[in-house]
Amino acid sequence: MYNNLLTELEKSTFSKYKRVIVWGFPIDTHTHSYIHAMWIKAFSVGFGKETHWLHDNKIPHDVDYNDSIFITEGYADNKIPVVASSVYFVHNAISPEKYLDKNVRLIEIRFNVNEIHDINNDFKLDDGTHYLTELSPHAKYEKLVSNKDLHASKRGGEIKLMDYECIYMYWATDLLPHEFNYDDINVQKENAIYYIGSPCRSINYPIFANACIKNGIQWVTSNPWNTPLSFEQNKQLMQRSILCPDFRPIGTQQDTALFGVKNGKNHLEIGYLPCRVLKAISYGQLGITDSIHVKKILGEHVLYADNMETLFASSMTERVNYPRIRKAMEYVQHNHTYVNRAIELIRALCQ
């Protein structure tokens, strides 16, 4: 369906691999499972590739693991088959030796942020030690020469020379481009906000929620760890919400003490772009954020204010600015679906 978006080099490189195997986190067992589900959807529906979703407790004997593109996560790859003819994209590649000791190609998937310090990551892209190649306006590639960007606890406090690669990328909405429906802008709204997401520490969230409640708007939360929703249920609840804001967590005092203000849980500081705001826009809602970094990334396509009372008031005005919402939908449709992300992985393969 979307193979026409690939260059001849990208088509040739992609065709060398017979299948895509996503490994780990069966659906609803972890919030990362929704990302895994989208890799399956993008490569199977979007590019017509044979796909399999396997995990440590589901290892069939009739799947050929040779010449495959594996996509996994460093905490879910204990029993993953490591095959010389395949390539491995690993988010949180906390044990690169697992792959490199078997002489396979390893490409780590990292958050597309300039700086992050946590139990997995320890890097700052503008410190003079990183040499990046732009894959798209939304993704970068780097040839790594050591494990220095891993947190010291993951490398035994020792920096070792290693030959692997990484891609810095965002996540995306769960709609593929052909699934966007501009009539969704007109879905009838309820006098409620259905806020679906993991509980987190946020200064702005309660202020905005209180502004809604003071104005007679019901605030309803749903925790995916306790009550997983299907993609369609999530979409419908977000579409029915009178507003669809997103609030980034700030991390805990302990996180700051251990890793500094640019710790991985402090999304307001590191500039993490969440899928929630991209989903909201793709579903026909006004994009709303409390993150200046998200504003810088999405520009005119998202509403931002540092004062939550102001953000609430402007959101209530702009929520019926249908030309603005449509323009934002078009932007996300062309830039932030898993078709875009899949193409970025393929471009990394071409490096």
Where are these regions (language model features)?
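A conserved mid-protein helix/loop that constitutes part of the nucleotide-sugar donor-binding site
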Residues: 34, 200-210
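Extracellular/periplasmic catalytic domains that process cell-envelope and extracellular macromolecules
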Residues: 14-15, 124-126, 186-189, 237-239, ...
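Catalytic binding pocket for nucleotide-activated donors in carbohydrate/polymer assembly enzymes
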Residues: 20-28, 33-47, 51-56, 222-351
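Conserved donor-binding/catalytic core segment of Leloir-type glycosyltransferases
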Residues: 22, 181-202
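Alpha-helical scaffolding within the catalytic cores
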Residues: 94-97, 175-180, 229-233
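Short beta-strand->alpha-helix junction loop in the catalytic core
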Residues: 112-114, 137-138, 156-182, 199
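N-terminal pre-catalytic "stem/leader" segment of glycosyltransferase-like enzymes
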Residues: 1-133, 140-144, 158-160, 214-222, ...
